[in-house]
């Protein structure tokens, strides 16, 4: 964040809260600190993923989001295993479970969002959430191909990310843009399913 301030770049920080690092109190302190520091820096609430957070911890994030009326961001439905384990734990997919906690009442976004149902798409659309696709990471980790064409058809905004160096060999946004369209066409079995402007 300090480097962004030095260069005049806009920066959005997102907490990666989980059962093993930081605490809701620390996240709240960072949220208040960075959102007052400079108009170029914003800090959004977030947590790593449903499977790395206890239900109690997720409730605290949701309560914070309601208190500050702010969006929440997290890794969501990245792998089939994640989805199946969430269904075994709570009887719902990750988006449905998080929605039941009121997590996205003020919007937000999901990173990856590879394995989703029609009901999950309804959650994203209803809360005006963003999907942040990470095709290089999903390819490296064999997580699957995100249904980008479905998101576009349902008017769910899609952003492109890299995930991070631990799960992506190359943090090149131009490569990610190519992968988004190329993998989507492969999934749809239609070379015209995504045009250049999309």
Listing of model-derived features with the role each one plays in the protein:
Residues 2-117:
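Metal-coordinating catalytic core of metallo-dependent amide/deamination hydrolases
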Residues 16-19, 78, 135-139, 164-166:
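Short, acidic/turn-prone active-site loops that include or flank metal/cofactor-
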Residues 47-50, 113, 140, 162, ...:
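Glycine- and other small-residue-rich loops at beta-strand/loop junctions that grip anionic moieties
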Residues 100-107, 149-198:
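His/Asp/Glu-enriched, well-ordered alpha-helical/loop segment
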Residues 110, 115-118, 139-145, 170:
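C-terminal active-site-proximal or functional interface alpha/beta core segments in diverse enzymes
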Residues 110-113, 132-134, 159-162:
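Active-site neighborhood of phospho(di)ester-bond hydrolases with catalytic His/Asp-centered motifs
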Residues 120-128, 134-140:
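Long hydrophobic segments that form regular secondary structure
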């Amino acid at each position: 964040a300090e480097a962004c301030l030095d260069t005049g770049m806009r920066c959005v920080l997102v907490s990666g809260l989980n059962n093993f690092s930081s605490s809701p109190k620390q996240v709240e302190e960072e949220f208040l600190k960075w959102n007052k520091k400079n108009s170029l820096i914003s800090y959004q609430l977030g947590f790593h993923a449903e499977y790395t957070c206890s239900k109690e911890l997720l409730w605290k994030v949701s309560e914070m989001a309601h208190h500050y009326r702010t969006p929440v961001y997290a890794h969501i439905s990245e792998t089939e295993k994640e989805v199946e384990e969430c269904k075994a734990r709570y009887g719902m997919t990750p988006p449905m479970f998080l929605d039941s906690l009121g997590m996205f009442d003020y919007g937000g976004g999901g990173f990856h969002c590879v394995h989703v149902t029609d009901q999950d798409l309804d959650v994203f659309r209803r809360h005006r959430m963003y999907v942040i696709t990470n095709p290089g990471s999903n390819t490296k980790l064999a997580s699957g191909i995100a249904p980008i064409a479905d998101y576009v058809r349902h008017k769910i905004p899609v952003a492109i990310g890299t995930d991070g160096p631990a799960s992506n060999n190359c943090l090149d946004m131009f490569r990610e843009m190519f992968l988004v369209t190329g993998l989507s066409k492969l999934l749809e079995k239609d070379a015209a399913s995504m045009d250049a402007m999309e």
